[in-house]
Amino acid sequence: MRLSQMLFVTLRDDPADAEIPSHKLLLRAGYIRRIGSGIYAYLPLMWRVLQKVSQIVREEMNAAGAQECLLPQLQPSELWKESGRWDTYTKAEGIMFSLIDRREQQLGLGPTHEEVITAIARDMIRSYRQLPLHLYQLQTKFRDEIRPRFGLMRGREFIMKDGYSFHVDEDSLKKTYQDMYQAYSNMLRRAGLAFRPVEADSGAIGGSGSTEFMVLAEAGEDEVLYTDDGKYAANVEKAVSLPADAEPSQFTAFEKRETPGTETIEKVTQFLKASPTQIVKNVLYQTVYDNGVTVLVLVIIRGDQEVNEVKLQNELTKLAPNYGAKAIINLTVPSAENQQTWTAKSLPLGYIAPDIADEYIAANKQIHPKFVRFVDKTAVDLKNFITGANEAGYHVVGANWGEQFPLPEIVVDVRKARPGDRAIHDSTQILKSARGIEVGHIFQLGTKYSQALGATYTNEQGEEKPLVMGCYGVGVSRLAQSAVEQSYDKDGIIWPVAIAPYHAIVTIPNINDAQQVEIAERLYTELNQSGVETLLDDRNERAGVKFKDADLIGIPYRIVTGRAITNGKVEIVERATRQSQEIPIDEVITTLQQWIKAAIEQKN
């Protein structure tokens, strides 16, 4: 392709609304154009990158035995209501675009396709002989993001590969899950990315287990905790660890003490000259289920620890059937305004004890009359601890479970693991932190969707059983931008060779020099004919402008038909290393073929 004929406009300055380097560079280099909030056009260079990423994804999925299909973007609300996710996705998380057609039927623009694929399986799979079955698609998805940001990282529409597998049992599912683990690792390796698979929370998708594939980058939205021995890595939402041991309490007798102005852990530790590890902290939450029922939750945790709200939400979701509900709409620490909607009398905030009376909750049929009390494992073994006295300005010291306070029945792990904690698999290993961009996620769904939608098969004994499912997603457009986030410098993008829009760019320093033009034209034609995808910068611009643009767009190899042609050579500059070599013109094709092959094979 000739740059003189391409829709190609670069910017010298960073766009004002771009926050992270990859977003700035893709806009500046003319790869994408913002059309609206979270909505981008993929321009010719970007489309080539996306096609290359998609091809790698296709090859790995096909090699794993999956079959490509294409599912509808418009999805009837009835399917989502069958699975119980319509309210979750249109009210709670609020990420599904929904609309009403001329027949007054509700529809959703698909952010994901579990319901659709399960409905197809329900209609078409009858026997164990048809299993296992694995289908996938590459398609534009939609999410009504509250705050679209970071370009293609968190847009309102994006390209995604989503796959779904069906099985007779968990063993079959686990095999495909492992196949996908390997396939996803292959995809990212082939794309030239540094990545880390991590244990993850399944979120609204559900299921028994999941793994995220994180591209490591400082601008990543996710925190990953890992150990140096390579045996543990997890998203911070899912991570587990061993906290530091609690310090022994200096309070050996139970006593109520006046502690004015000590509503926070920091203030009470200073006032009592105690360690936060000696304190039982009581954190109040308010959760609203999808049937409108409000439940007040008291999380009892060691004073130096923080509540992991993802873990807490998972525990509360397990309790949803107790309140006639399926999912959580909202989980918050209630504001003073929210408290007024359910309190019968003023709460002693900052001084709450584990046994705060249920009488604080006003009588209301939409409000559960009792606190749900979770005690985190970090608080269970504390002795002679400090905690609130249920009276403003007072704490108690020297308290014990089973004496002054009953130990709540529900013992959970809802603490937030953090760097510096000891690893559970080996207490000599210390958790470290890195930032990552989630570009892939694989799930073991089990029978969540098949049971909800009645998708069954007949086994060898003639019994009807629910299909066991897995699902597997790769953000194609996000992966492409994450490659930029991981590899750039002050001058522009440094594309991995495998997904670069072109392998090489031939730059003519002086468009008025007939010899430069002639050699450039010949190399451009012969390189493309030999399989080296090549751009020709034949614009009537100064050489400095052309060199800057070549660096900005990040093409791996720049061929310059400058002074060296008088010696029968051209200059080739490698974008990643900036190393420059003069190569005989007749050897350019074989040299580049070898370099490109070596660069791609190194990642395979």
UniProtKB/Swiss-Prot annotation:
GO terms for molecular function: aminoacyl-tRNA deacylase activity; ATP binding; proline-tRNA ligase activity. It comes from the Bacteria. One of its GO terms (cellular component) is cytosol. It is found in: Cytoplasm. Keywords: Aminoacyl-tRNA synthetase, ATP-binding, Cytoplasm, Ligase, Nucleotide-binding, Protein biosynthesis. Its EC number is 6.1.1.15. It catalyses: tRNA(Pro) + L-proline + ATP = L-prolyl-tRNA(Pro) + AMP + diphosphate. GO terms for biological process: prolyl-tRNA aminoacylation. Homodimer. Consists of three domains: the N-terminal catalytic domain, the editing domain and the C-terminal anticodon-binding domain. Belongs to the class-II aminoacyl-tRNA synthetase family. ProS type 1 subfamily. Catalyzes the attachment of proline to tRNA(Pro) in a two-step reaction: proline is first activated by ATP to form Pro-AMP and then transferred to the acceptor end of tRNA(Pro). As ProRS can inadvertently accommodate and process non-cognate amino acids such as alanine and cysteine, to avoid such errors it has two additional distinct editing activities against alanine. One activity is designated as 'pretransfer' editing and involves the tRNA(Pro)-independent hydrolysis of activated Ala-AMP. This is Proline--tRNA ligase. It comes from Trichormus variabilis (strain ATCC 29413 / PCC 7937). The gene is proS.
